């Protein structure tokens, strides 16, 4: 149990730092759409898609790796709370169209990236 907790801790910290770095780099590029959060969510969705595909095929992988990557890293990297706050800020500023676009791009993009990663990994490992 301690190993699992440590894996979540390390993965979550690493993912959070990666998200912060992406936000620092990409959020200033566009005032209406927080590109750092979008990038973090899309990358995280892609990584978790690969992870789930990989873990479903490789059943002998230590559970520590599973929680390090999915719950830890992807949980720290992706952020529904920041995304939600950014949408609320856009709404408060009266940017309703941008808020709606932000919701659709984040949600649909994340679903698409997870499905794409799962499909790509599954196709590349099919025998």
From Swiss-Prot:
Localization of this protein: Cell inner membrane
Catalytic activity reported: fluoride(in) = fluoride(out)
A GO biological process held by the record: fluoride transmembrane transport
GO CC annotation, single: plasma membrane
Signal peptide range in chain numbering: none
Loss of function: phenotype: Mutants show increased sensitivity to fluoride. Knockout mutant displays pH-dependent hypersensitivity to fluoride ions. Deletion of pagP (crcA), cspE and fluC (crcB) increases sensitivity to camphor and exacerbates the nucleoid morphology defects of the topoisomerase IV temperature-sensitive mutants.
Principal place of residence: membrane
Binding site for Na(+): 75, 78
UniProt keyword annotations, A-Z: Cell inner membrane, Cell membrane, Ion channel, Ion transport, Membrane, Metal-binding, Sodium, Transmembrane, Transmembrane helix, Transport
Membrane disposition: Multi-pass membrane protein
Induction, per UniProt: By fluoride, via a fluoride-responsive riboswitch.
GO MF annotations in UniProt: fluoride channel activity; fluoride transmembrane transporter activity; metal ion binding
Activity modulation comment: Na(+) is not transported, but it plays an essential structural role and its presence is essential for fluoride channel function.
Function noted in UniProt: Fluoride-specific ion channel. Important for reducing fluoride concentration in the cell, thus reducing its toxicity. Required to counteract cytoplasmic fluoride accumulation driven by pH gradients across the bacterial inner membrane set up by mild acidification of the growth medium.
Family label: Belongs to the fluoride channel Fluc/FEX (TC 1.A.43) family.
Name of the protein described by the UniProt record: Fluoride-specific ion channel FluC
Organism (species): Escherichia coli (strain K12)
Gene: fluC
């Amino acid at each position: 149990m301690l190993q699992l907790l440590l894996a979540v801790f390390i993965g979550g910290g690493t993912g959070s730092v990666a998200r912060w770095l992406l936000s620092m780099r990409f959020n200033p590029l566009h005032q209406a759409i927080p590109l750092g959060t979008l990038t973090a969510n899309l990358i995280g969705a892609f990584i978790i898609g690969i992870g789930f595909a990989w873990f479903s095929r490789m059943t002998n992988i230590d559970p520590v790796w599973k929680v390090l990557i999915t719950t830890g890293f992807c949980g720290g990297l992706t952020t529904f709370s920041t995304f939600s706050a950014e949408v609320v800020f856009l709404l408060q500023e009266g940017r309703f169209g941008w808020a709606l676009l932000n919701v659709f791009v984040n949600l649909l993009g994340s679903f698409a990236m997870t499905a794409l990663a799962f499909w790509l990994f599954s196709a590349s490992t099919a025998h």
